[in-house]
């Protein structure tokens, strides 16, 4: 919001702003209480020291499926981060939408996603207890379908409500899978490799999945948007691209619902240690 209000979104000052905020957070981090790592008394091998024992979890069908779907869903994570702004801003080239708030203040509109992300964290304990980890992860997957689909159908004029709704469901899409997935790993792994398993979860989602998703999304946008010569064709291409992303997320959600088996235990959720 500050970046948008100050007009930094099209200048190098946005990076200066981020640098200042980063330094402020670094100073704040120094003031946090000390949390020493439990290293244990035994000598560890190089494999254990590097956390590679977590890869043995792929021998378990349930964990292997979970990590594979984590990667598949991770494909969706960075798509809107990279393309939401240029998509919404592109409407400035269409006279009908050139003067709309959304087309001229895309960052302010997109910032609603972060507000939703913050608030949706508060819903996770209730939803996990009530519906279970699998259903919460399914909610996240279908939320990604809505996130992309609403982008594909909306516009910053009369359809701006679809953009706003897309920003709202982002909180469910992002939080519900990342938090519930982390709790799943916590519940299903031995304490000796739990930290490494959490790292593997992050690698599969924000590492492999996000990288594949960014490259794949760029290919889709190049095919349907950047290859067009007219503004109207590019706008139609953006809509097609978002619907392609929505279709992908829908396929992942359906297959996950069919092949991933997990029995909900409310007590296990309630007794998760931190």
Segments predicted by a language model, with ranges:
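Intracellular juxtamembrane helix-capping segments at the cytosolic ends
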Residues: 176-190
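A membrane-interface helix-boundary motif in multi-pass transporters
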Residues: 4-20, 219-249
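Multi-pass alpha-helical transporter architecture, strongest
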Residues: 24-33, 238-274
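Pair of pore-lining "gating" transmembrane helices in MFS-fold secondary transporters
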Residues: 59-80, 168
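Juxtamembrane intracellular "pre-TM" segments in multi-pass secondary transporters
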Residues: 34-66, 93-95
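C-terminal ends and interior cores of transmembrane alpha-helices
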Residues: 142-156
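Short amphipathic helix-loop junctions that connect adjacent transmembrane helices
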Residues: 4, 82-106
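Helix-to-loop junctions at the C-terminal end of transmembrane segments
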Residues: 3, 119-133, 221
């Amino acid at each position: 919001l500050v970046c948008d209000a100050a007009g930094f979104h099209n200048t190098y000052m946005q990076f200066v702003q981020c640098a200042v905020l980063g330094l402020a957070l670094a100073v704040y981090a120094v003031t946090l209480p000390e949390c020493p790592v439990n290293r244990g008394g035994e000598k560890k091998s190089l494999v254990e020291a590097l956390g590679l024992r977590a890869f043995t979890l792929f021998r378990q069908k349930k964990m292997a499926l979970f990590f594979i779907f984590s990667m598949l869903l991770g494909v969706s994570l960075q798509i809107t981060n990279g393309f939401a702004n240029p998509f919404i801003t592109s409407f400035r080239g269409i006279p009908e939408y050139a003067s709309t708030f959304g087309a001229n203040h895309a960052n302010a509109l997109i910032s609603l996603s972060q507000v939703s992300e913050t608030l949706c964290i508060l819903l996770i304990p209730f939803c996990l207890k009530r519906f279970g980890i699998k259903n919460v992860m399914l909610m996240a997957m279908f939320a990604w379908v809505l996130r992309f689909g609403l982008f594909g159908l909306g516009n910053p004029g009369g359809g701006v409500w679809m953009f706003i709704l897309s920003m709202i469901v982002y909180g469910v899409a992002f939080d519900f899978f990342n938090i519930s997935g982390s709790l799943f790993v916590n519940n299903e792994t031995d304490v000796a490799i739990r930290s490494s398993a959490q790292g593997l979860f992050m690698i599969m989602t924000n590492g492999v999945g996000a990288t594949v998703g960014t490259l794949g999304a760029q290919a889709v946008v190049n095919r349907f948007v950047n290859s067009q010569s007219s503004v109207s064709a590019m706008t139609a291409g953006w809509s097609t691209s978002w619907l392609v992303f929505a279709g992908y997320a829908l396929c992942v959600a359906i297959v996950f619902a069919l092949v991933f088996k997990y029995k909900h235990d409310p007590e296990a959720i309630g007794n998760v240690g931190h």
